[in-house]
């Protein structure tokens, strides 16, 4: 494709409304006790997540549902599919697999920030990690990732990729490949 010569430049947007997960009453009461006790008594990690639970509860009073903008930006045969999340890698791979474009770039943390969005599998008994803990930064419902992937792929399928331009094959190395990576360490 000649530099800067795109036949199609276009964009589409889809807004999703995704509910936030809510801590149980027992979880919130325990979190309040741990926050009051302080990190020295509750333990640093427990206190941090307890504080996050209290912050999430305050946020839920004002914003129980997150507005999530998913966007598709087409530049010829290339598409950027954006979301306002810190996606798990698998969700980006799912976007690429579902896109009809020959060159697909999943783009995270675009047009906002709704925090971590793990895969559904990360919430299973063998999953876990700080990204799956209910907090002010990771709180969308468990199906948020697949919803965003589906919206991105749908937007891509509503667009038609331009044909990739033909390029000549790279010349052969003639048995003299790049050697910089094959040098031994130098320890004078």
Named regions from a protein language model:
Residues 1-188:
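Non-catalytic substrate/cofactor recognition surfaces at enzyme active-site rims
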């Amino acid at each position: 494709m000649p530099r800067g010569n795109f036949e199609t430049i276009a964009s589409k947007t889809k807004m999703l409304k995704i509910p936030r997960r809510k801590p149980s009453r027992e979880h919130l009461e325990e979190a309040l006790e741990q926050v009051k006790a302080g990190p020295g008594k509750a333990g640093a990690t427990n206190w941090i997540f307890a504080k996050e639970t209290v912050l999430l509860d305050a946020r839920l009073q004002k914003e129980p549902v997150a507005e999530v903008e998913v966007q598709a930006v087409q530049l010829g045969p290339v598409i950027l599919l954006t979301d306002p999340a810190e996606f798990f890698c698998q969700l980006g791979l799912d976007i690429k697999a579902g896109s009809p474009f020959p060159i697909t770039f999943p783009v995270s943390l675009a047009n906002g920030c709704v925090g971590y969005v793990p895969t559904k599998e990360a919430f299973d008994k063998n999953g876990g990690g700080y990204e799956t803990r209910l907090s002010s930064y990771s709180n969308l419902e468990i199906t948020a990732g697949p919803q965003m992937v589906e919206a991105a792929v749908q937007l891509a399928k509503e667009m038609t990729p331009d044909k990739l331009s033909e390029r000549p094959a790279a010349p052969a190395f003639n048995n003299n490949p790049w050697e910089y990576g094959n040098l031994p360490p130098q320890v004078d």
